[in-house]
Amino acid sequence: MLAKRIIPCLDVRDGQVVKGVQFRNHEIIGDIVPLAKRYADEGADELVFYDITASSDGRVVDKSWVARVAEVIDIPFCVAGGIRSIDDAAKILSFGADKISINSPALADSTLITRLADRFGVQCIVVGIDTWFDDATGKYHVNQYTGDENRTRVTQWETLDWVQEVQQRGAGEIVLNMMNQDGVRNGYDLTQLKKVRDVCRVPLIASGGAGTMEHFLEAFRDADVDGALAASVFHKQIINIGELKAYLAGQGVEIRIC
């Protein structure tokens, strides 16, 4: 059995790490490189960096900080933000990233997933899915350009359909960003995770809602996700990664102990 992964998420805007609630009202957390090093030292299994306004601004993630992060950490990390071509991805990987993640650009052109997977291998290609539960319809819908609340829009895709589509296109991993839960720290949306897990054959990462160690346990035990991504509980030092891993191991979760 592969070990479950604990993954801090660093949302980047204007060269700094920020954090919002339900993808809105972002506050500045701190500088990118020191936070990355802190999480690596605490025992994170990997890191994810999202340049949250790159896609909506029509630009590619700033590669200068990617190189600086690669110099100070020795764990895998994934970078996302406005990647629209093989050349964009190649440059980010050449600066030291281990994976690249695409979200809004994949919704604009789903063939991008296949082209990237063919060039770099599926293990390198992550698709992020920003999903919102609509109380009126009782369905989960995929959103686009979520880094800018003034440009965010609901797409034609229902979440489960898009999960299946990106796998067929060549996604090697899926990060499910559950927008309703984001930043509120009352637990992952287990109902949605279970539905997605039923149709997801590639590694599935839960994102949005972690507030306690028990929330991580529930995601691993009840929804069988491969990794759990979180931000505010780590940024605000509510949960220490080493202590979290010790707790999960004590509950029988296969986890890498540092």
Swiss-Prot record:
EC number(s) recorded for this UniProt protein: 4.3.2.10
Assigned GO CC terms: cytoplasm
Swiss-Prot/TrEMBL keywords: Amino-acid biosynthesis, Cytoplasm, Histidine biosynthesis, Lyase
Cell compartment(s), UniProt: Cytoplasm
Pathway: Amino-acid biosynthesis; L-histidine biosynthesis; L-histidine from 5-phospho-alpha-D-ribose 1-diphosphate: step 5/9
EC class: lyase
Family under the similarity heading: Belongs to the HisA/HisF family.
NCBIfam families given in the database record: hisF (TIGR00735)
Name of this chain's protein: Imidazole glycerol phosphate synthase subunit HisF
Organism annotation: Salmonella agona (strain SL483)
Name of the gene this protein is made from: hisF
